[in-house]
Regions:
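Extended, low-hydrophobicity, Ser/Thr/Pro/Gly-biased non-transmembrane segments
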Residues: 69-76, 80, 100, 107, ...
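Hydrophobic alpha-helical and helix-loop surface patches within well-folded domains
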Residues: 206, 267, 298-568, 572, ...
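Long, ordered, helix-rich scaffold segments
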Residues: 437-438, 442, 477, 549, ...
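N-terminal, polar/Ser/Thr-rich
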Residues: 2-102, 200-206, 226
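Aromatic/His-enriched, Gly/Pro-containing loop or helix-boundary segments
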Residues: 143-170, 210, 214-217, 361-382
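Beta-strand elements of well-folded, non-transmembrane domains
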Residues: 87-91, 106-112, 123, 183-185, ...
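A surface-exposed beta-strand-loop module
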Residues: 124-199, 603-607
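Surface-exposed beta-strand/loop patches in extracellular or lumenal glycoproteins
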Residues: 109-125, 233-239, 564-581
Length: 959
């Protein structure tokens, strides 16, 4: 958001007052939002005139047949596909379903003789061809006998089209496999699917795709593994007046097919690429464009969004970010165009399809009057994340999904670098500590965590692949790569990336290939080996806590576990020890780096005398937590109290986060952790405050139903008051927002916590006379104001907010309202809202699970949401996609407040009751929730009274 956007002084005051209860603030927001799409409940399989298929054959018992294995054999290698698809954007007259038809010819080479063809296929109906089978096989090589197809069938469990031949395919020969098929253009957000929206009272339909990780097979038969790269010749048939897009540049012309006047769009052949990076879209969207150094950049979205200028920010930032990565990789962008499109329905945040990146609307579209500072940062970082993939992931691709972290961890690291290039005044690179390092510590500290890199044979099924799209792959990957870049130096790190990309361009690699290149570049600088360090980091889960005893200089490490009583069953070849790079300072002076290479060692330089203090892991570049002897903790706390700016701002955030988590792990006392917050009345920086609030959220979750809640509120209200007054002065009594990016974030923290704790100035009685004023609320403050307003209101106000949500035309505004609707204190409204989540007419499928989590975040809604998920799990899982990445977030979200034996038993029963249904990508989250709940029960039993006493002592009146 630009710093020139202000609100008037009296309006600013009212906007703060209303966080205590005036829903009238929402009245000013009268905008038109697209109606929710109607769900087609007809479950009939899609058909097309004249097409039939043999019934699927499913093997009921385990077998060793190739078609019962989830991995393709290596004897067939695709070269290219000729694919024509025709999505129908109106329902089929016979079935009432939206369908697509297609035909495909794939050319492949035989690398080993075989009489069996396996090609992935899911939820497709095939036309029986003239040979009586589901496919036709011909030879590319002249004079070569082509075996006949003896039998063809669909193996639904492992998702294959199987062709048994009457003879062998010859090694070194090439063949064509032709199929004709029909699929449903469903609203399931996977494969080739349907998105809907309303425009000027008319329902519009978009045909779009999401292939990653294993849904290209839902769009056409293909060798659907990342190492099976090929060239794709794509043709789309579509209604005239609509626009067709795919990975390559397009050329369209009108044709007539079966007396239908349609458009035929032919795309330039792709580069050699993986199936999961394919995309094809048909819509009547509009676009804006620019050309930078010969690369055509286009931003597509709904016509009203483009007309309103919502694509301008993305267009303006894409070019600089793209140029940054060209320089960073020392490699030109390999395609002639870069299309980015905002979709009304999209399950992930964005997808890096090569040349056609797809986004949720909230991840690409920015409106200066409705989008907040955090919305803008999200757009910049997600664009950078996806553009980073154009080289790291697309040009060079993982060989198999067990190395997913190499794709996603790398993009999650350099997204901060790319966003910094786009917005250098933000200091966004520092935020990786809060957004990724601290985030993943919470997961990786569980005994049920998993290593960055799994064994290939352990990741076979689509659900197992989906499980890997988690905080470990994204955030731990980013954190560890940042650490490597730091101790190797950015120069060596980027040099290794460049040689790696050069060697494996248009091919596939494993993570050890990258280490080889980093090692080669390291050896050009110093004769030090990288292998021991990375070998220890990547095959074992978790991370260490490093303890420094400043009395003796002894530095030691152990595996950090949030619950020290939990049992680690996964063996480690390194016994959960790490080689730890330690950057540190003594009393404000930076010291020489130190490497801990064993369980413990002595470093005399780390002894502290008198008032000296030691602080390790400067700027949190290392992937570990730090503990100290009690005396050094005391000196650090004294330093925070007397001259906190002597400690780097990132490390002030680190001290708070480390202390609270060390206390949860019983390594230090909870009282010591709470003492790290006492200096906050002097703190004005965002990162320490955000770190404190993130950790105090755990206290809210554990104690907002107990007698601890009142004294805790009193203490936090006391601590936030100076920050609140600071921003009140800085913004001239709330007449504007601060200039700085971090200051804007911290202003929101100050207001949110002041509202949450009932600061007197924000109570309705203070300025009730102006509470009915009509005005606009700054986008940064809307989430806070809306939530507090709805929490203090009743059913009529909730209904009004619901109507504003349904009519919102700005995706970020709709998201704020959708979240705020979960803040009501009326149980019946929350129960009804839960029912809405499973009705796509009310809540889009992409938003269903996050809405349930919003409701669970409400102390009143938590038990309602949990009961709802338990009762509806089978329906949620089957109707909302067993491979959806969002199930882990759902399970973690509805169970994070669990802290009683009763809730633990319910959770275990939930796991047992739904074992047959399954949990898909949430499988690991169930075990993590059980482990987390067990730890919470113990922690409350051991700490509740001490915490209560501490808050009471800190809020006693001073006479």
């Amino acid at each position: 958001m630009g710093k020139g956007f202000y609100i008037s002084k009296p309006v600013g005051i009212v906007s703060i007052i209303l966080c205590a209860g005036a829903l009238a603030t929402i009245i000013a927001l009268s905008v038109v939002y697209s109606e929710e799409k109607a769900k087609n409940n007809n479950q009939v399989s899609p058909t097309d005139g004249g097409t039939t298929s043999k019934p699927p054959v499913t093997t009921l018992a385990p077998s060793n047949e190739p078609w019962d294995k989830y991995r393709l054999p290596k004897n067939l290698v695709p070269d290219h596909y000729n694919l024509t698809l025709w999505p129908r954007l109106t329902p089929d007259l016979t079935t009432g379903l939206y369908i697509f038809t297609g035909k495909s010819t794939v050319e492949f080479e035989t690398t080993e003789e075989t009489d069996l063809i396996l090609i992935h296929s899911s939820k497709l109906n095939y036309t029986i061809l003239e040979n009586g089978h589901l496919a036709r096989l011909t030879s590319v090589n002249s004079g070569v006998r082509v075996p006949l197809i003896k039998v063809s069938w669909l193996q639904s469990v492992t998702q294959y089209l199987v062709l048994q031949l009457d003879g062998k395919l010859m090694t070194g020969h090439r063949y064509h496999l032709y199929t004709k098929f029909t699929g449903e253009l469903a609203d399931d957000l996977g494969g080739f699917y349907r998105s809907e929206y309303m425009e000027d009272g008319v329902k519009k339909v978009v045909a779009t795709t999401q292939m990653q990780p294993t849904d290209a097979r839902k769009a056409f038969p293909c060798f659907d593994e990342p190492a099976m790269k090929a060239i794709f010749y794509i043709t789309l048939i579509h209604d005239r007046g609509t626009v067709a897009l795919s990975n390559g540049e397009e050329k369209g012309y009108p044709v007539t097919i079966d007396n239908q006047h349609v458009q035929k769009t032919v795309f330039e052949p792709t580069e050699k690429m993986s199936t999961y990076l394919l995309a094809f879209i048909v819509s009547d969207f509009d676009f804006i464009n620019n050309t930078i150094d010969g690369v055509w950049i286009r931003i597509f979205a709904r016509k009203p969004a483009i007309a309103a200028g919502q694509g301008e920010y993305a267009l303006n930032k894409t070019g600089p970010i793209l140029k940054f990565f060209e320089k960073y990789y020392n490699s030109s962008y390999p395609l002639p165009k870069s299309d980015q499109i905002a979709l009304p329905d999209f399950n992930a945040g964005a997808m890096e399809n090569w040349g056609l990146i797809t986004y949720r609307e909230t991840a690409l579209l920015y409106d200066k009057e409705f989008s907040s500072n955090s919305n803008k940062q999200r757009i910049a970082t997600i664009i950078a994340h996806e553009l980073a993939h154009m080289w790291f992931g697309n040009l060079v691709t993982l060989r198999w999904w067990n190395d997913l972290w190499l794709n996603e961890g790398f993009a999650s690291y350099v997204e901060y670098l790319g966003a910094h290039e786009a917005e250098p005044d933000w200091n966004v690179k520092d935020l990786i500590v809060l957004g990724d390092v601290h985030r993943v510590f919470a997961v990786d500290a569980l005994a049920s965590s998993h290593p960055l890199s799994s064994k290939e044979e352990d990741i076979q099924k689509p659900a197992q692949i989906s499980e890997l799209f988690d905080a470990i792959s994204y955030s731990k990957g980013a954190s560890v790569l940042r650490m490597l870049s730091d101790f190797l130096t950015e120069e060596v790190f980027t040099m290794g990336l460049r040689t790696y990309l050069s060697e494996f361009a248009f091919g596939n690699a494993v993570y050890t290939d990258l280490w080889k290149h980093l090692q080669m570049c390291l050896c050009t600088r110093i004769s030090r080996t990288l292998r021991p360090t990375v070998n220890i980091i990547f095959p074992q889960m978790g991370f260490p806590v490093v303890t420094i005893d400043t009395k003796t200089g002894v530095v030691s490490q152990k595996h950090f576990l949030l619950d020290p009583d939990s049992e680690v069953t996964a063996p480690s070849p390194f016994n959960y020890e790490w080689i730890v790079p330690i950057k540190w300072m003594k009393t404000g002076a930076v010291q020489s780096p130190y490497w801990l290479r064993g369980k413990s060692a002595t470093n005399d330089a780390m002894k502290a005398l008198g008032t000296e203090w030691v602080l390790a892991n400067l700027n949190v570049v290392g992937y570990y937590r730090v503990n100290y002897d009690e005396e050094n903790w005391g000196r650090l706390l004294n330093g925070l109290s007397t001259n906190h700016q002597l400690i780097p701002v990132i490390n002030r955030a680190q001290l708070v986060d480390d202390a609270f988590n060390l206390a949860r792990a019983k390594i230090i006392s909870t009282v010591l952790a709470l003492n790290t917050t006492k200096y906050l009345d002097k703190e004005r920086e965002y990162m320490p405050w955000e770190s404190a609030l993130n950790n105090l959220d755990f206290f809210y979750l554990m104690f907002d139903r107990s007698e601890v809640y009142g004294p805790m509120q009193d203490y936090l209200r006391k601590q936030v008051t100076p920050l609140f007054n600071y921003y009140k002065t800085l913004t001239e009594n709330w007449s504007k927002v601060p200039d700085g990016h971090m200051d804007q974030y911290n202003q929101v923290n100050a207001i949110s916590l002041a509202c949450r704790t009932g600061l007197e100035e924000l109570k309705p009685s203070a300025l009730s006379v102006v509470m009915l004023s009509f005005f606009r609320i700054h986008p940064n403050l809307r989430s806070t104001v809306y939530c507090n307003a709805i929490a203090a209101s009743g059913a009529n106000e909730w209904e009004f907010a619901w109507s504003q949500f349904k009519n919102a035309t700005i995706a970020t505004e709709a998201d704020k309202l959708r979240s705020a609707l979960a803040c009501t204190k009326q149980p019946w409204l929350l129960n009804r809202y839960l029912e809405y989540t499973l009705d796509p007419k009310m809540i889009r499928k992409q938003d269903a699970t996050s809405t349930i989590v919003y409701i669970a975040n409400n102390v009143i809604g938590q038990s309602l949401a949990w009961d709802f998920v338990r009762a509806r799990w089978s329906y949620i899982f089957t109707q909302y996609g067993g491979g959806s990445f969002s199930f882990s977030n759902l399970i973690n979200g509805v169970t994070k407040r669990f802290s009683t034996e009763f809730e633990l038993q319910q959770l275990k029963q939930f796991k047992e009751d739904n074992a047959e249904v399954g949990f898909g990508s949430g499988t690991l989250a169930v075990d993590q929730s059980i482990e987390r709940t067990t730890a919470n029960i113990k922690w409350i039993a051991e700490n509740k009274q001490n915490v209560l006493n501490w808050f009471r002592d800190e809020t006693k009146p001073v006479f």
